[in-house]
């Protein structure tokens, strides 16, 4: 194409100008540790799923109640995968109920809440459906509506936000009842 002065346009400049008009998106992996500060969860491992539209949080023992005429839900969360040792209790206002189709094709009516999510130092509101994800690989699923226009997903990598520090297990103390070590070396006379 030519501009008004019959000169060729530099395609590289056009692409560069187009990139400048869009905010730069940060990259995240297909697995990330996210925080849900409003729910008291410092870190929960989430699967970043570009194939899922909505986001879901593992929740069980759901009890609905009214607070000043508004529907709320109280629930429990096991934030760590493959263990029920730690339980967090939380409550949130119910935004609505939504019919969600699982990856197996089954539909389920789930309560939807809005809460803050934190990833790579960025905090924003996200809609979460509450469902029992005990049998699923991840306690949280972050669907594309949650990260759209905020992040690009590198499906081949994980944990761009880092991983939480693991607590070191204390080394076992030597048992005082143990027999002293025997030296089996022999010396010749």
Region spans (language model):
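Pepsin/retropepsin-fold aspartyl endopeptidases
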Residues: 14-189
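Short, Lys/Arg-enriched N-terminal segments with co-localized hydrophobic residues
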Residues: 1-16
């Amino acid at each position: 194409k030519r501009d008004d002065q019959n000169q060729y346009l530099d395609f590289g400049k056009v692409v560069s100008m187009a990139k400048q008009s869009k905010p730069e998106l940060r990259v995240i992996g297909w697995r990330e540790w996210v925080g849900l500060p409003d729910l008291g969860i410092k870190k929960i491992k989430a699967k970043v799923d570009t194939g899922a539209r909505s986001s879901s949080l593992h929740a069980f023992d759901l009890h609905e109640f009214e607070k000043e005429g508004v529907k709320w839900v109280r629930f429990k969360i096991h934030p760590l995968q493959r263990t029920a040792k730690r339980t967090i209790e939380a409550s949130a206002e119910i935004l609505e109920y939504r019919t969600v189709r699982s990856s197996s094709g089954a539909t389920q009516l789930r309560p939807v809440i809005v809460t803050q999510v934190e990833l790579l130092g960025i905090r924003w509101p996200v809609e979460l459906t509450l469902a029992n994800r005990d049998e699923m690989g991840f306690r949280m699923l972050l669907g594309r509506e949650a990260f759209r226009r905020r992040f690009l997903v590198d499906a081949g990598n994980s944990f761009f936000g880092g991983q939480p520090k693991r607590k070191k297990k204390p080394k076992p103390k030597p048992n005082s009842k143990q027999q002293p070590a025997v030296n089996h070396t022999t010396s010749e006379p």
